[in-house]
Amino acid sequence: MSLKLEDVSFVYGAGTSSETKALNNVNLEINKGEFVAIIGHTGSGKSTLIQHFNGLEKATSGNVYYDGKNIADKGFDIRGLRCKVGLVFQYPEHQLFEESVIKDVCFGPLNQGCTKEQAIEKAKEALQLVGVREELYEKTPFELSGGQKRRVAIAGVLAMNPEILILDEP
């Protein structure tokens, strides 16, 4: 399993008067078992870059490959890629939307085709892994503290058992 970017550039508002270049000819390869940190100043393109890893953003030019396959090719399974490349956003609490913690964390596994029972089991394992107490499972995530919300959001991605986990300053 590998993730590879070749000469990836990205422009916000391409072709408009507000065109802003965010990435310029980025080359990067991440292989199984590697830990990679991307550092830079605010506004340097870190979040934009990682959104290319699972196809949330499409390169203006260049190519992104997952396991040797170009993710921009017709017929490439982007939905499957998003299950394999889990992304926890910079403000993970903005990822929460369900009426209870357990339902929120079950969302990903259910969308991967798990039964309700399987999804609940995966959700409980992920919540325990990040230290969310069982008495919070039926609470609305919006009543939790900021730190608890972040843990729940991270659990939601971990419950999908991604091959690659991307953390954008969670």
Regions found by a protein language model. Give the residues of each.
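The feature captures the beta-strand-to-loop junction immediately N-terminal to the Walker
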Residues: 39-41
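Hydrophobic anchor residue at the start of the ABC signature
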Residues: 154
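Conserved catalytic motifs of ABC-family nucleotide-binding domains
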Residues: 161
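Conserved ABC transporter NBD signature motif
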Residues: 62-73, 81
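Helix-to-loop junction immediately C-terminal to a conserved catalytic motif
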Residues: 54
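Conserved ABC ATPase signature
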Residues: 140-144, 148
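Conserved ABC ATPase "signature" region
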Residues: 117-135
